[in-house]
A protein has these predicted regions:
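Short, well-ordered coil/turn segments that N-cap beta-strands
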Residues: 1-2, 30-34, 68-74, 90-92, ...
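Catalytic alpha/beta core domains of metabolic enzymes, predominantly
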Residues: 114-219
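Glycine-rich phosphate-binding active-site loops on the catalytic face of alpha/beta enzymes
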Residues: 9, 98-100, 200-232
């Protein structure tokens, strides 16, 4: 099992340290490979007033402290080719956002680094069209594909478990299930995205039972006070229960 978990965006060293320490404790209990995630810039905002984050310089400096003190691997996302050089010496995994999953130059540049490349599958993309994304990843150290829900009308996402099964059976790369973004309601709150975190535990159990072994969860001590993605983020206090269930329902393929 592998779990990627952390806040939507990096807020401060103290904040990320608290989250990373608790997530690592829970994952270590089960012998799960843990990766801390956080964004330095949330470029894809519903509104011009949406909070973007503290920036690359502060985030990468704090990430180095996290890595040194907690001995955790790190993931962050990039939105342009030039951002890759800002992060590649610090993080272990470079993430391509879902809305940029077809951007050839961005994918190929990320694949030239020594980092693993995690590509979020766009909400608009069919599972069988992932082969086009993978055709752009030659030379990568490793590639992961992350499922984060499928568009189902306005402001609505659904989880297509048959699509996840197709990707597990078809592609020779890890398929990560992003549980918390799958319960998002994009733009659903007018000037920000909505969501419903109460669906997270059930979706995590279902994915584990069907053979998913890689999970992505955004967590926060006080999600309703988070600068972004609060409605779909998991309470940090609930993280252990969800991970316990993932282990309990795990199906060995």
């Amino acid at each position: 099992l592998r779990i990627i978990a952390g806040p939507c965006q990096h807020e401060s060293l103290e904040h990320s340290m608290k989250i990373a320490r608790e997530c690592k404790r829970v994952c270590d209990k089960h012998g799960i490979d843990y990766i801390f995630k956080a964004s330095f810039d949330k470029a894809n905002r519903t509104s011009i007033n949406g909070e973007r984050g503290v920036g690359a310089d502060v985030t990468m400096s704090d990430f180095q402290v996290l890595k040194n003190e907690l001995k955790v691997n790190l993931l962050t996302d990039v939105h342009s080719v030039e951002q890759i050089e800002w992060v590649e010496k610090i993080v272990d995994v470079i993430q391509i956002p879902a809305f940029l999953c077809r951007q050839t130059d961005l994918i190929q540049a990320a694949c030239k680094t020594d980092c693993v490349v995690n590509i979020k599958k766009g909400q608009f993309l069919a599972p069988w069209d992932v082969k086009g994304i993978l055709s752009k990843t030659e030379g990568a150290k490793a590639v992961w594909i992350t499922e984060r829900g499928t568009s189902f009308g306005y402001n609505t996402l659904v989880v297509d478990f048959t699509g996840i099964q197709h990707m597990l059976d078809t592609y020779n790369v890890p398929i990560v299930f992003d549980v918390t973004h799958s319960v998002q309601r994009p733009g659903g709150n007018g000037t920000s995205s909505g969501g419903n975190r109460r669906y997270v535990p059930g979706l995590a159990r279902a994915a584990s039972a069907m053979g998913v072994t890689d999970f992505f969860l955004e967590v926060h001590p006080v999600p309703d006070m988070a600068p972004s993605d609060g409605p779909n983020m998991l309470h940090l206090d609930d993280f252990e229960r969800v991970v316990d269930d993932i282990v309990r329902y795990s199906y060995s393929r």
